[in-house]
Amino acid sequence: MTLVFGSSCRLAVTLIFAFVSVFVFCEYVIYYLVILRCSWPLLEIEDSHSPLRALFLSDTHLLGAIRGHWLDKLRREWQMERAFQTSMWLLNPEVVFILGDVFDEGKWSTSQDWEDDVRRFKRIFRHPVDTKLVVLVGNHDIGFHHEMTKQKLERFEQVFNVTSARILTIKGVNFLLVNSVALHGDHCPICQHVEEELQKLSHALNCSIQGAQHNGQCKNAARFAPAAPVLLQHYPLYRVSDAMCTGVDTAPLDEQYLLFQERYDVISKNASKKLLWWFKPRLILSGHTHNGCEVLHEKLYPEISVPSFSWRNRNNPSFVLGTFSQSEFQLSKCFLPEERTVLVVYCSSCLIIALITLIHLKMFRNSLQFTNNLIGKHKTL
């Protein structure tokens, strides 16, 4: 009898250890195993200056108080926190850009809900002091154009220390940060202000590139590194659909030929032409669609749409790694663990543990019955 109960105790300890091991693997270890496969792309031309290493992600969609079920919040936010913290530890980027739709309900959240969302964001995306975090605005952060207000925009800009149009220069690399929600072209006050700022930035950047700061028209212009910028915004530039996209994580086939709506799925054709004409960017990075896309505008300007970072929007989220110099850049994509894989590991492990338990219980009953029979025979004797 003692041997039987001793065996049961050993099984219980083994099962607890198995459950803990599976949990640790699925919630911690798997992120290291997957992200370890990622590496920074190398530039083809060596530069005397060390290149800039930048990480780009998009559409985190932190759930709010209205639509966010607690279990959905817990699962998705934990996934993003582990993915981001593991990436920071393994890859150590110098700058991280989040390309909008940080929150899911910023467009209608109250001041109290907004503060709670911001607190959770800062916990999930905490980063080393030597890593710069730059956040762009998306339609879910301040609302679509007809929902956008000065109050919503200002509270976003105050929290993340951004403006709707500016050039950020790091290691001689110019990043043009644009509030694409305000590129509606209807001359609303916010839209008009953003367009005026973009024109000023275009003028100043062209003066810097041409080295004409002492020219009369450029005398009072701001100075930037003499290099074409990397354009960053939430909405993609105008394209008819995702049918022209290439890449391994494009939209599903049944969605690729759905026509995009200007100012809703992509910025307008006119706004796209203005940005390309004013800045002639060497690269465009955007989000919004939740799918990957690589497309070439006017056979000259490459655009990469960065997929969503959250399991809530896709099974295989990812982010983009970029290595930049003033004259060159290289990109690579880093995929995160797939939600389907984690669920399969959990289900398979639970099934195996259940089978082992059932087999042991059957053996336990047989042993108990055998012991009882022996005791009965002993009493008879």
Swiss-Prot record:
SUPFAM superfamilies, sorted: Metallo-dependent phosphatases (SSF56300)
Role, per record: Metallophosphoesterase that catalyzes the removal of a side-chain ethanolamine-phosphate (EtNP) from the second mannose of the GPI-anchor protein intermediate. Participates in the glycan remodeling steps of GPI-anchor maturation to allow an efficient transport of GPI-anchor proteins from the endoplasmic reticulum to the Golgi.
Gene Ontology MF, one: manganese ion binding
GO cellular component terms, semicolon-separated: endoplasmic reticulum exit site; endoplasmic reticulum-Golgi intermediate compartment membrane; Golgi apparatus
Enzyme class, UniProt record, top EC level: hydrolase
Main location: endoplasmic reticulum
Organism this protein belongs to: Danio rerio
Keywords assigned by UniProt, alphabetized: ER-Golgi transport, GPI-anchor biosynthesis, Hydrolase, Manganese, Membrane, Metal-binding, Transmembrane, Transmembrane helix, Transport
Motif (Di-lysine motif): 377-381
Protein name in UniProt: Metallophosphoesterase 1
Pfam families: Metallophos
Gene Ontology biological process terms, A to Z: endoplasmic reticulum to Golgi vesicle-mediated transport; GPI anchor biosynthetic process
Binding site for a divalent metal cation 2: 59, 101, 234, 290
EC number: 3.1.-.-
Transmembrane regions listed in the UniProt entry: 15-35, 341-361
Membrane topology: Multi-pass membrane protein
Record-stated family: Belongs to the metallophosphoesterase superfamily. MPPE1 family.
Domain notes for this protein: The di-lysine motif (KxKxx) acts as an endoplasmic reticulum retrieval signal.
Superkingdom of source: Eukaryota
Cofactor(s) demanded: Mn(2+)
Residues the record lists as binding a divalent metal cation 1: 101, 139, 234, 288
Compartmental location: Endoplasmic reticulum-Golgi intermediate compartment membrane
Binding note for cofactor: Binds 2 manganese ions per subunit.
